[in-house]
Amino acid sequence: MTPLLRFLNRTSLVTQIVIGLLAGIALALLAPAIARDLAFLGKVFVSALKAVAPVLVFILVMASVANHRHGQETHIRPILWLYLLGTFAAAVVAVVASMLFPSHLALSTSEASLSAPGGITEVLQNLLLSAVDNPVNALLNANFIGVLTWAIGLGVALRHAGETTRTVVEDLSTGVTLIVRVVIRFAPLGIFGLVSSTLAQSGLDALLGYLHLLAVLIGCMLFVALVMNPLIVFWKIRRNPYPLTLLCLRESGITAFFTRSSAANIPVNLALSERLGLHEDTYSVSIPLGATINMAGAAITITVLTLAAVHTLGIQVDLPTAVLLSVVAAVCACGASGVAGGSLLLIPLACSLFGIPSEIAMQVVAVGFIIGVLQDSAETALNSSTDVLFTAAACQAKEQRNG
């Protein structure tokens, strides 16, 4: 065995990711030209994750449902309640922070052509259409609502199949999981490429003009990750929540921060759930579902940026209206999940509830894209790490009750 292989076997994946992160920063500062050329490493890694995620979810969920025995329990309902509670709590935190530290934007015109939803009804219609999408189309376009619908439907149908068929489905699930593990082993190289190229191309100059807005956004996300989420987990498991919280942030949040896609981070969360010894019938459904509907980070982004526009335009808004807006916007945000920067497209919808015209709302979206290097990364890290955190909390709480 070569010294390199021995080193890789001895050090944990997280340590290797941190080394890749530091090496990426160093390369971007010392040799920006080389760093820009290494962007393909990050692109290959993210593409591999995105390629494997829909297949993984489809096979895992189908196998889980098909092999579910009558009398076995899944804990999806309490996890769904945790997702909703976490998103609502994040929205409230964002509203309070925006009221205490109002941000003002230097709004400029945006040349980007974005297709934002026209209203809440349209978003809900799109979600329903996603659920009844062609299964091949859903897999090709990583439409996770459609993938979940077909996986659950086929899983239920295969419950009545012979034992041999169900064994084949289970073996397929094991095979896909093995491929995912191989992809995840390349995370340090992928993150090295992502960090070095992003810093070399954007630099930090683009962020300096929006430091206050970024401070409010990142501050809210840190508060939710380190205070609100642990409080919710403590209420659920009745013991110190921080070991589990920090583990999820370290193992899931770091990779999500750099891939900037909840969908791409699904394989990482599934692998972490397996290592934590969680209930497979539960996490194989709740993790991909969380990547679609658990949008605490999106709730913060939509609320803070919308209220920044509100403050800039001098519109008066009372607290209940602001909370209601952020909850409605966060619920709608699931329509743009799994896409890097997806939550920004919901800002025009949120702004319309305050009577802010689309032209100005699109300028706010442009501001969002300028700070997106940090905003979208932090948002995805919060969203994705919360998926596995709440799944683990619900499973552990159930185990404690069962003794």
Swiss-Prot record:
The chain crosses the membrane at residues 14-34, 44-64, 79-99, 138-158, 175-195, 214-234, 295-315, 327-347, 353-373. One of its GO terms (molecular function) is neutral L-amino acid:sodium symporter activity. The keyword Cell membrane applies. Coiled coil: none annotated. The keyword Zinc does not apply. It holds the Pfam family SDF. GO terms for biological process: serine transport; threonine transport. Its main location: membrane. It is a multi-pass membrane protein. One of its GO terms (cellular component) is plasma membrane. It comes from the Bacteria. Keywords: Amino-acid transport, Cell inner membrane, Cell membrane, Membrane, Symport, Transmembrane, Transmembrane helix, Transport. It is found in: Cell inner membrane. It catalyses: L-serine(in) + Na(+)(in) = L-serine(out) + Na(+)(out); L-threonine(in) + Na(+)(in) = L-threonine(out) + Na(+)(out). Involved in the import of serine and threonine into the cell, with the concomitant import of sodium (symport system). Belongs to the dicarboxylate/amino acid:cation symporter (DAACS) (TC 2.A.23) family. This is Serine/threonine transporter SstT.
